[in-house]
Amino acid sequence: EKVEMLHSKTNMSSEGVPRLGIQDIKYTDGPFGIREENGDGFRPLGWKLDSATYFPTGSALAATWSKEMAYKNGWAMGKEGRLRGKDVILGPAINIQRLPVGGRTYEYLSEDPVLAARLSVEYTKGSQEAGTAVCLKHYALNNQETNRGSVNVIADERTMREIYLKPFEAAVKEGGAMCVMPAYNKVNGYYCSENAHLNNEILRGEWGFK
């Protein structure tokens, strides 16, 4: 039963434990809208009387420099997610904008770690107070799409903490983020999903993530 809970049941759900009354966890891959799953992918459902909201990209949201707007954006996403029966939004995407030509740079909030941190906190609070958990992504140092599954990002401790980890730290410690998604890349030689320094020492040990 524990193993079943730790991997996908479908493309966007994890197995529950019916014997204990634990329901499946249903995800939606934001971060700009609540998508509906169709079998193994995201083909059109063909619904005639339904549509989804397309929310602003991270860059557009950050351009407001408004904590209030970030909260409202998160709250609206969370509210729509709850109405559609979702438990977790796979977002916000809060990596630092490092490369202007990066394939997903538009998803991220800013090149400014303080701005990204402040807005991440408010978005997180808004969504979770509306009833849908966030899943912060991509932890950590996922700042390019080229070879994102294999690139080894080399960074010293001060650089990581002052720039790249700051939004994640704030969203966990101040926003109370319920989920964190590991990045595909390596950091200093270890894949993020099995990086003891990032996950055990910093995320759990220092920031108190549970």
What are these regions (language model features)?
Residues E1-K210:
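Glycoside hydrolase catalytic-domain context in secreted enzymes
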